[in-house]
A protein has these predicted regions:
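Helix-loop junctions on the outward
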Residues: 16-53, 96, 102-105
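Membrane-interface helix caps and helix-loop-helix hairpins in membrane proteins
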Residues: 76-77, 100-115, 122
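Membrane-helix boundary/juxtamembrane motif in polytopic membrane proteins
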Residues: 81-86, 111, 132-159
Length: 173
């Protein structure tokens, strides 16, 4: 589990850095006149919120999280390599394809890039739910249950992102 722990620490470090940057970007981009933190935030003159920090964070951490998941399963080296070679590029592609839509104010453009980024997302789910299942037949029931729970948690948590991506398109900012 040493590799997984190292990857986990790297993910936490990358995320901490980027979320501090996101916090700073938000503080520079938005102001409120209210006392005690209550009131509406408005765009600060001459500043904009940098969406790039979040996407760079995801571009680095999502492939690492998927690699960590595969490494911790202690699968046969050939299967592990096969899964990593498919999951890591798909996750990077998913994030990279979502960014142009995220920064666009045009609904059509957001929809196109959102749809394009959903294709690698569905592929990742396919690999985790179909391809990984084939290798679990030889595992004890407890391992199969743990992996099944992990996949459902991943689907539930990552499944929020396409919904959150679509909300500004159909319901406004």
């Amino acid at each position: 589990y040493r590799q997984a722990l190292v990857m986990s620490a790297v993910v936490c470090g990358i995320a901490a850095y980027h979320y501090f940057r996101i916090f700073d970007s938000f503080n520079a981009a938005f102001v409120t006149e209210a006392q005690g933190g209550r009131g509406m935030y408005e765009q600060a003159a001459g500043h904009s919120f940098n969406e790039g920090y979040r996407y760079v964070d995801w571009l680095l951490t999502v492939p690492l999280l998927l690699a960590e998941l595969i490494v911790v399963l202690a699968l046969a080296r050939k299967l592990q390599t096969s899964l990593l070679v498919r999951l890591i590029p798909a996750s990077a592609l998913m994030i990279a394809l979502g960014y142009p839509g995220e920064i666009s104010s045009d609904t059509f453009t957001r929809n196109v890039w959102g749809l394009l980024s959903t294709i690698p997302f569905l592929y990742i789910l396919y690999v985790l739910f179909v391809e990984l299942t084939k290798s679990l037949d030889r595992q004890p029931p407890a391992v199969r249950k743990t992996v099944s729970n992990m996949r459902l948690l991943l689907f539930a948590s990552w499944g929020v992102y396409p919904i959150a991506y679509l909300i500004p398109i159909y319901f406004g900012d």
